[in-house]
């Protein structure tokens, strides 16, 4: 792989579009941060949040610096990572050519109801055709599924030896449909057709989201008269042109975590460290040795999907500051992997919702889904292919938040509402760790009273569901939520560090009784007995970044016995990393 250092002259604008915030930084001479700011990410129209962040950072430019000195714009994003972790995708039809049933099963393509159509054709290991491509079958698949999907993916057996059937299928699809088409052979030259098909499917599923992002970026840059090349961070930390990202959005899986690794090294000057990036939706952990992150030899693993995308070896878990906190069937607090709008932010944005929250919080007999609220996202219309139940829910929602109990009657209705949210049509709000931090006084900026109502509702719900019939205080609920985030963050860090040495597994994977007890006691900060305790120790610095890092990681580091570094620009570290990278191009030739 050839690495080309970026021209350090002038100003570089770094952006990071995350699940909750869009961050912006300006670097001067490739060395120092001269301005930074952030704005809420507006998922229904990304241009609003991006524009707000860019205008804020430009307004903070020091005297004597001008926007026309910006010579590079580079963007990292967690949109693809979050979509994979939350299983929130565009609907896709995958055509698999020359696959048998076992290959389809091994690919996992039918997981979560994916549309897969087997087509006759394919090649052998020498590139010879096994049979002619079933062109009529391709066209029939488009006719049957084209109206209810947003993209197509095509994967043929041994297409890395002979891609002609994939190319012909794409031409046929484009002849009758305007939808984007991904060919598997263009994403990886490695063998393993089922995994190549999965990677192509993920690429197709992510195409609408990345197009939305890049189009929004283009509009804002034109409005702000910024004329500079636009680059996107890849999962290995290098940069690619925006035009390339439009064709291969799956390359942006782990874009945000990769930028966080680059930014952490840039801001701290460390060469050997463990970095943990806690955002609104996920926590991402990576190990850096000798100034270079470890690259996953097997491809990026995110949300249980093993792709063929070259990326930094990152452990991603669905836990962040805005993870949805609910009680499970055993009436235990659980956080994630779904993200929700914090109740404190909901009431900050829609003050009228506070009275509804107060009314629910004073009830002994709670409605179903008592902490959940939902509203329509602006500027969105319901597509015609949505189900009848989704249509009824859409009609019941408004641009102002409503209690979910007022529009949803059962679990099926809640699942349909979540599908609307997954499609970007609606927003769901719930109690989150960010709310807990507001109640505990460790975070400010939004509506603390709304957060306290959410905690009180959870306490009542817990009392009603358990035999003890005792009610925890809102502060106790919030302290337990804090403990959830701390302990799960510590587990993610421990798993990532143990995985660096072959043969060493985390206690969660081994389930060894003594090992589990020792490690869990250390993570939880509790004694083993009256005369014994367990401690852990990391031999490298722990660099904690992300907006919530300062609230949780002093305690995480203490429990892991790690020296902690929270750098000066930790809340916008990803945006720093977006412009502190390199342009890279790799070429592989089969002889």
Protein language model features and the residues they cover:
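N-terminally biased helix-coil "hinge/interface" segments that flank
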Residues: 2-591
């Amino acid at each position: 792989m050839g690495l080309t250092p970026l021209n350090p002259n002038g100003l570089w604008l770094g952006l990071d579009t995350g699940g909750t915030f869009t961050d912006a930084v300006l670097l001067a001479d490739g060395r120092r941060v001269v301005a930074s700011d952030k704005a809420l990410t507006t998922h229904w129209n990304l241009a609003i949040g991006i524009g707000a962040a860019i205008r804020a950072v430009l307004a903070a430019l020091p005297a004597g610096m001008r926007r026309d000195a910006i010579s590079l714009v580079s963007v990292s994003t967690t949109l693809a990572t979050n979509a994979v972790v939350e299983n929130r995708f565009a609907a896709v039809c995958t055509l698999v050519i020359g696959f048998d049933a076992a290959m389809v099963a091994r690919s996992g393509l039918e997981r979560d109801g994916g549309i897969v159509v087997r087509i006759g054709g394919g090649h052998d290991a020498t590139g010879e055709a096994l049979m002619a491509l079933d062109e009529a079958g391709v066209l029939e698949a488009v006719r049957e599924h084209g109206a209810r999907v947003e993209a197509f993916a095509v994967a043929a057996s041994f297409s890395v030896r002979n891609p002609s059937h994939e190319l012909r299928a794409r031409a046929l699809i484009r002849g009758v449909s305007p939808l984007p088409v991904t060919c598997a052979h263009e994403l990886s030259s490695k063998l393993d057709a089922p995994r190549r098909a999965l990677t192509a499917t993920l690429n197709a599923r992510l195409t609408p989201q990345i197009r939305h992002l890049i189009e929004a970026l283009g509009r804002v840059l034109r409005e702000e008269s910024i004329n500079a090349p636009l680059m996107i961070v890849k999962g290995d930390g290098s940069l690619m042109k925006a035009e390339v990202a439009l064709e291969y959005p799956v390359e942006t899986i782990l874009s945000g975590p990769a930028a966080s690794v680059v930014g952490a090294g840039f801001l701290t000057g460390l060469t050997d460290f463990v970095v943990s990036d806690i955002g609104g939706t996920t926590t991402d952990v990576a190990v850096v040795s000798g100034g270079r992150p470890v690259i996953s030899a097997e491809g990026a693993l995110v949300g249980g999907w093993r792709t063929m995308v070259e990326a930094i070896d990152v452990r991603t878990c669905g836990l962040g500051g805005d993870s949805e906190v609910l009680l499970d069937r055993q009436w235990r607090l659980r956080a994630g992997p779904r993200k929700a709008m914090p109740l404190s932010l909901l009431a900050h944005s829609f003050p009228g919702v506070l009275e509804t929250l107060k009314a629910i919080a004073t009830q002994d007999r709670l409605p179903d889904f008592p902490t959940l609220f939902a509203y329509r996202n602006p500027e969105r219309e319901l597509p015609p292919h949505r189900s009848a139940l989704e249509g009824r829910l859409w009609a019941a929602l408004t641009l102002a938040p409503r209690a979910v109990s007022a529009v949803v009657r059962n679990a099926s209705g809640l699942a349909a509402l979540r599908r609307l949210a997954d499609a970007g049509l609606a927003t769901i709000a719930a109690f989150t760790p960010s709310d807990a931090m507001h109640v505990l006084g460790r975070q400010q900026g939004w509506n603390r009273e709304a957060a306290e109502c959410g905690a009180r509702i959870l306490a009542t719900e817990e009392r009603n569901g358990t035999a003890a019939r005792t009610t925890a205080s809102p502060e106790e609920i919030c302290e337990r939520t804090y403990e959830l985030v701390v302990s799960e963050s510590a587990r993610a860090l421990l798993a990532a560090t143990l995985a660096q040495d072959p043969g060493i597994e985390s206690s969660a994977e081994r389930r060894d009784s003594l090992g589990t007890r020792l490690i869990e006691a250390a993570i939880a900060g509790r004694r083993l007995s009256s005369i014994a305790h367990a401690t852990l120790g990391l031999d490298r610095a722990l660099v904690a970044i992300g907006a919530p890092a300062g609230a949780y990681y002093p305690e995480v580091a203490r429990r892991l016995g790690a020296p902690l570094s929270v750098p000066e620009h930790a809340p916008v570290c990803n945006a720093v990393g977006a412009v502190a990278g390199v342009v890279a191009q790799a070429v592989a030739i089969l002889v």
